[in-house]
């Protein structure tokens, strides 16, 4: 936020995940800005204080694909990172088992360049304050950028994951391309500052569902592999894993889980842990 509080949203632009666009008191905050080479119009978290963010209410980001979820629109506030840590610790005490955290640093270089906000330092400080900055703590930190992870590697001991998009390259390293970084030589470089990669699902499973070489090459470099994002809807599935029906109809989720396991993936990002975890346990 503008007053340097870490909050949890899918991106810094707020209109997809909150009701900010319907708030007349914030109409003057709407602007168009360059977000890593794309011109985006909307309301941005870095222009709001936490007190202002507190007045907003969350809403479903993908209502066309998940119409059932809109019944929750307007019920919840935007959580801070500190509140999520507190929730995880409360659930640990309640359930008697460890609960992990997997925060992502979104647009760290852009936020530093445009707003002077150092989210790397803020997150490192928040992890230390929570007692979650050591190698044995159940925390991974992920980012799509190189230099922020390199800095974080010097500030905390928790494992770090370099996220990899479908195409292009990291925003903070204009001369690097993801394709080159996924070669054995590129993966060896990543291993100097990160503990794993979080690749786009299509880099791990081809369109026909067969595994690529990426997991094996990453493991050879000593890296974990956590692909993203396994979602239940046809819309997000590889062609071989789609069922008949509309884009929001369920795809072949259990088969996707099996293929990822066969590929050797060490974990997976999912919007549907209530479906994916049982599928893993059945195997």
In which residue ranges do the predicted regions lie?
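Phosphate-group recognition and catalysis centered on beta-loop-alpha active-site segments
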Residues: 1-283
């Amino acid at each position: 936020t503008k007053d340097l509080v870490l909050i949890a949203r899918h991106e810094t632009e707020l209109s997809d995940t909150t009701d900010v666009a319907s708030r007349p008191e914030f109409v003057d905050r709407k602007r168009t800005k360059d977000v890593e080479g794309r011109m985006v119009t909307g309301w941005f978290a870095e222009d709001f204080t936490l007190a202002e963010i507190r007045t907003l209410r969350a809403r479903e980001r993908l209502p066309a694909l998940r119409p059932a979820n809109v019944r929750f629109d307007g019920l919840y506030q935007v959580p801070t990172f500190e509140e999520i840590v507190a929730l995880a610790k409360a659930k640990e005490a309640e359930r008697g088992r460890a609960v992990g955290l997997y925060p992502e640093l979104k647009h760290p270089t852009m936020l530093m360049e445009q707003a002077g906000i150092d989210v790397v330092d803020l997150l490192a400080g928040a992890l230390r304050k929570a007692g979650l900055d050591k190698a044995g703590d159940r925390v991974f930190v992920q980012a799509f950028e190189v230099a922020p992870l390199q800095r974080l590697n010097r500030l905390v001991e928790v494992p770090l994951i370099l996220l990899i998009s479908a195409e292009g390259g990291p925003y903070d390293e204009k001369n690097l391309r993801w394709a080159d970084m996924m070669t054995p030589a590129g993966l060896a470089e990543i291993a100097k500052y990160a503990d794993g990669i979080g690749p786009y699902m299509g880099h791990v499973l081809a369109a026909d569902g067969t595994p690529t070489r990426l997991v094996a090459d990453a493991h050879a470099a000593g890296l974990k592999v956590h692909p993203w994002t396994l979602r239940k809807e046809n819309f997000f599935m590889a062609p071989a894993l789609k069922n008949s029906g509309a884009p929001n109809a369920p795809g072949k989720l259990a088969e996707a889980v099996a293929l990822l396991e066969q590929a050797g993936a060490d974990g997976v990002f999912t919007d549907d842990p209530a479906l994916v975890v049982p599928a893993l346990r059945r195997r």
